[in-house]
């Protein structure tokens, strides 16, 4: 299977335990995970942030005053995907621990999830859409060697 091209910018904000998150996110892995979720060529920025920045972005752009695991800012979907994916490191780490997943497996899931959002998939528009998106995530992650993230 030929994968779509990806121009990737990987950024890390300043936050406690940043080195742990950098180690879990080698650039080649992040690119591989995203490329497997792409249905067209893309330019994507991935930014890993601390709780304060994550909360500010969620508050400012979604009117929800808490840090969330992943935010997707999609600018174009066709013929070329352009998007920013912002992942909040402390939230991702807590969720991984709570769900007994490795940090890397949870990041892979959230990057696939965010990449699908960037292409127009939305699990919040109805049960059928949620099932379609989850099925795609499970299939993509299985192809990457990760377990079903919803178990």
Swiss-Prot record:
GO molecular function terms listed in the Swiss-Prot or TrEMBL record: metalloendopeptidase activity; RNA endonuclease activity; zinc ion binding
Alphabetized UniProt keyword annotations: Cytoplasm, Endonuclease, Hydrolase, Metal-binding, Nuclease, Ribosome biogenesis, rRNA processing, Zinc
Residues annotated to bind Zn(2+): 113, 117, 123
Gene: ybeY
Gene Ontology annotations for the cellular component aspect, listed alphabetically: cytoplasm
SUPFAM superfamilies: Metalloproteases ('zincins'), catalytic domain
Stored Pfam families: YbeY
Functional note: Single strand-specific metallo-endoribonuclease involved in late-stage 70S ribosome quality control and in maturation of the 3' terminus of the 16S rRNA.
Family to which this protein belongs: Belongs to the endoribonuclease YbeY family.
Matches recorded under NCBIfam families: rRNA maturation RNase YbeY
Enzyme class name: hydrolase
Primary localization class, coarse: cytoplasm
Gene3D superfamilies associated with the record: Metalloproteases ('zincins'), catalytic domain (3.40.390.30)
Keyword Hydrolase: yes
Record bears the keyword Nuclease: yes
Domain of life of the native organism: Bacteria
Name listed for the protein in its UniProt record: Endoribonuclease YbeY
GO biological process: rRNA processing
Cofactor(s) essential for the protein: Zn(2+)
